[in-house]
Amino acid sequence: MGNLTVSQANNIWSPNGNSLAVFVDGVSGILKLKDALGNVQPFEDYVTVMYGTGGIYSQTANSTPITATTSELTLIDGGVGTLNVPANGFSVGDSYIANLSGIMSAKNNNSLIIRIKSGNVVLAQSQPLVMPAINNQVWNLQVNFTIRTIGGANIASIVTAGEMHVLKLASGTQEGFGFSAINNTTFNTTILNTLNITAQWSSTDVQNSIYTNLFVLTKIY
């Protein structure tokens, strides 16, 4: 893990013998922080939380197209910032907004499901959106979520709401749907949480394709 280069003057003792420390990883060269429970995270993950509101993540490349498959796959690609909130990094009232846009094609009457996740935990998901026949059309998705309570599973609570719109170029109209959910059973703020947004088609038809060319995550409270 590398040598300890900087540490708190009065290290915090914990029952398992760990202490709060900041160090440079000898392999990756990344500045990291070890908390009093022994959890190790990149230091920037903690800094993002401590600095409060503002930009958290900005995608800098198109995501891999989800095409001709019924597998649930991510709409997110690489970027700058972080999608991680470290263990015990949330506070009650923390609120975020995610804005995504991209290009989509679909076969008439095939459907699409959008899921908002933290790791493998589903925070919210849409009902199947039955698509019109479209080709290379613009879509937009906005997701808001707020931490209601913190703690372990069955104690922590998060509310998530999303709204997606797809432009039908031929008619100039939009198709869309909204969804909202509260997760107060499997959401856990005492562990690392990593945001993911996924899409899943109902069929493997080659006309079905979606990718993201813009994604920005912002902490608003």
Positions of the model-derived regions?
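Predominantly extracellular/luminal cell-surface or secreted proteins
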Residues: 7, 34, 115-119
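Short, surface-exposed terminal/edge motifs of secreted or surface/virion proteins that either
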Residues: 1, 24-46
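Generic short beta-strand
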Residues: 21, 31, 113-114
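Surface-exposed molecular-recognition determinants
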Residues: 46-221
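Generic hydrophobic/packing signal
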Residues: 20, 34-36, 100
